[in-house]
C-alpha cells in the first residue's frame, strides 16, 4: 500500500526577505541599501507593476530616491512591515502556526552600513542574535539567506557594485563575519537568493543603474 502524508521530521516553514519585512531603514546604524531606493506607485495598474521599465533603475530615478529619504509611500521597502521593531509579536504568530523553520535574509547594510566599514555594526548583529535565539526558543530552525538582492548603496556609488572585485571582497568579509558571529545560531545557510535575477531584473539582482552603463548587457554578464 502506498504511504501518504509527510515524514515526521518534515520542515513546515515560512520565508521572507529582510528588505520586505524589516523596515527601519536608517535605524540603529543601518546604512542605505539598494532596495531602499526602489520606487513604487500605489496607483500603478497590475500591468504597470510588472513592466520592465518600472523595475529597472536609471540615473533619474536614483537621484530622485536619494533626494527624498522621508518618502515612505513610494519607497515601501523603507518601512516594510516594521518587523525590526515588532519581530517578537510576529514570532509568536509564527509559533502559533506551528512552523518549524523560518527562512529570512540578513541585511548586509545592517551589519556593514557602507559595505566596506572597518568594523561591523554591533546593533545589527545583536538584532539577528536576539531574533535567532528567540526562533530556537520557539522550536523554529533558522534558515538564513546571506544576500537577498540588497547590498549597501555605498558599494554601488563608490565601486560600481558587482562589477567590481572590491564588492566581492566585501561580500566575503561580510559572510565570514556572519559565520563567526551568528554561525552557532543558524541551522541552514543560503549564499544568494535567485542568482539569475541579474538577467531578468538587473537592479534587483546585480544593482546596476542602466544609463550609467556603456554596454548594459555586458555589464550584467560581468556582474554575474
Report residues per predicted region.
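Catalytic domains of carbohydrate-active enzymes, especially glycoside hydrolases
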Residues: 86-107
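Glycine-rich, proline-tolerant flexible connector loops at the mouths of alpha/beta enzymes
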Residues: 106-120
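Internal amphipathic alpha-helical repeat/solenoid segments
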Residues: 80-91, 113, 124
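Active-site mouth loops of central-metabolism enzymes
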Residues: 72-86, 161-166
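Active-site region of glycoside hydrolase catalytic domains
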Residues: 2-71, 95-96, 114-116, 125-224
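A generic structural signal for short
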Residues: 78-79, 119-120, 219
Amino acid at each position: 500500500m502506498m504511504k501518504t502524508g509527510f515524514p515526521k521530521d518534515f520542515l513546515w516553514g515560512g520565508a521572507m526577505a529582510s528588505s520586505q519585512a524589516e523596515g527601519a531603514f536608517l535605524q540603529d546604524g543601518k546604512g542605505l541599501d539598494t532596495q531602499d531606493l526602489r520606487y513604487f506607485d500605489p496607483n500603478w495598474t497590475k500591468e504597470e507593476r510588472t513592466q520592465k521599465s518600472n523595475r529597472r533603475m536609471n540615473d533619474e530615478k536614483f537621484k530622485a530616491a536619494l533626494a527624498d529619504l522621508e518618502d515612505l509611500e513610494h519607497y515601501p521597502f523603507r518601512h516594510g512591515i516594521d518587523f525590526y521593531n515588532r519581530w517578537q509579536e510576529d514570532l509568536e504568530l509564527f509559533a502559533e502556526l506551528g512552523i518549524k523553520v523560518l527562512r529570512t535574509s540578513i541585511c548586509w547594510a545592517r551589519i556593514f552600513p557602507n559595505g566596506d566599514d572597518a568594523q561591523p555594526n554591533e546593533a545589527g548583529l545583536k538584532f539577528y542574535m536576539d531574533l535567532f535565539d528567540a526562533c530556537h526558543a520557539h522550536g523554529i530552525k533558522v534558515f538564513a539567506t546571506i544576500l537577498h538582492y540588497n547590498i549597501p548603496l555605498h558599494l554601488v556609488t563608490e565601486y560600481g557594485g558587482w562589477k567590481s572585485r572590491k564588492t566581492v571582497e566585501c561580500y566575503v568579509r561580510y559572510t565570514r563575519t556572519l559565520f563567526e558571529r551568528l554561525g552557532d545560531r543558524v541551522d541552514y545557510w543560503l549564499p544568494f537568493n535567485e542568482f539569475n535575477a541579474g538577467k531578468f531584473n538587473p537592479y534587483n539582482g546585480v544593482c546596476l543603474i542602466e544609463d550609467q552603463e556603456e554596454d548594459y548587457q555586458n555589464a550584467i554578464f560581468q556582474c554575474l
